[in-house]
Swiss-Prot record:
Signal sequence, start to end: none
Keywords of the record: Activator, Developmental protein, Differentiation, DNA-binding, Metal-binding, Nucleus, Oogenesis, Repressor, Spermatogenesis, Transcription, Transcription regulation, Zinc, Zinc-finger
Alphabetical list of PANTHER family matching this protein: GATA-TYPE ZINC FINGER PROTEIN 1 (PTHR47341:SF1)
GO CC list: nucleus
Cross-referenced InterPro entries: GATA-type_ZnF_Regulator, Znf_GATA, Znf_NHR/GATA
Protein name: GATA-type zinc finger protein 1
A Gene Ontology biological process term: spermatogenesis
Name of the coding gene: Zglp1
GO MF term (any one): DNA-binding transcription factor activity, RNA polymerase II-specific
Biological source species: Mus musculus
Tissue specificity of this protein: Specifically expressed in adult testis and ovary. Expressed at high levels in the somatic cells of the developing gonads, including Leydig cells in the testes and granulosa cells in the ovaries.
Record-linked Gene3D superfamilies: Erythroid Transcription Factor GATA-1, subunit A
Polar residues biased stretches: 106-121
Length: 266
């Protein structure tokens, strides 16, 4: 009976204080140069928890000897103390390892929280409407607004006609054309049809330059006529610079007399 109790006691001692944690065996197994650092922790600034566990083991052994005949299933206070001690050691080691692996996260933990949670004010608003609606047509009697009509005239000019629509009226009120267009002389080229340059017979030009008597000239012919003041008296041909010395028209053979433009007369 006494031999069985002694065997159980030695087993409990081995479980509570295994031989791998014995300081004397560690000192004997390690060389003398490494003896001061045998019981140190991984980090030198952190206090080791092994002395606390060793004290708990020494205090738990007499208690186990007195309570040998206790219930086998009920945990003893010594095992609870050792369990809490081992938990503390494991938690401390995991904290130190995480700090060593990720030092930036431990220095500024608030940055990760702020970056993970974005405020609602920074959310993008959708460009398109959630419920898109079709615009009202001009024929709809509920339409109220201004309609602009763009028309390109034969003289390459742009005419914009605004139309004001009032609600409840099917008819629309149109403004008259521009005063310059309305007051155009009936004998001008606009009344006869599309404008045509009297010199080169073109109908397209970026800018019309009329002569002093209202004869339509294109941009190039108008600049030459304004600069040199020379044209054919019969067919209105404005000669080019290379034909200036000749006094005969290349189209009809008439003489090209210099005609003073209004700027040259001044």
């Amino acid at each position: 009976m006494e031999a069985a109790q002694a065997g159980d006691l030695t087993r409990r001692q081995e479980l509570l204080a295994p031989p791998c944690l014995d300081t004397e065996s560690l000192r004997k197994s390690r060389p003398p140069a490494l003896e001061p650092g045998a019981l140190r922790c991984l980090t030198p600034n952190i206090r080791s928890l092994w002395p606390t566990c060793q004290d708990s083991v020494s205090t738990a052994l007499p208690f186990l000897q007195e309570k040998e005949k206790g219930l086998p299933g009920s945990p003893s206070p010594a095992t609870q103390v050792l369990g809490s001690c081992w938990e503390l050691m494991v938690i401390g080691m995991s904290d130190h390892l995480s700090m060593a692996r990720n030092p930036r996260g431990t220095q500024c933990p608030n940055l990760e929280i702020s970056s993970a949670t974005s405020p609602a004010s920074l959310q993008r608003r959708p460009r398109k409407q959630l419920n898109p609606r079709m615009g009202i047509e001009k024929v709809d009697p509920r339409f109220k607004g201004v309609t602009l009509e763009f028309q390109i005239q034969p003289d390459s000019s742009l005419q914009i006609v605004p139309t004001y629509s009032l609600p409840g009226r099917s008819c629309s009120q149109k403004l008259p054309a521009s005063p310059s267009k309305a007051l155009a002389s009936p004998g001008s080229s606009e009344a006869l049809g599309p404008r045509r340059c009297a010199s080169c017979r073109t109908q397209r030009t970026p800018l019309w330059r009329d002569a002093e008597d209202g004869t339509p000239l294109c941009n190039a012919c108008g600049i030459r006529y304004k600069k040199y003041g020379t044209r054919c008296s019969s067919c209105w041909l404005v000669p080019r610079k290379s034909i200036q010395p000749k006094r005969l028209c290349g189209r009809c053979g008439m003489s090209q007399d210099p005609h003073l433009s209004p700027t040259q007369e001044l």
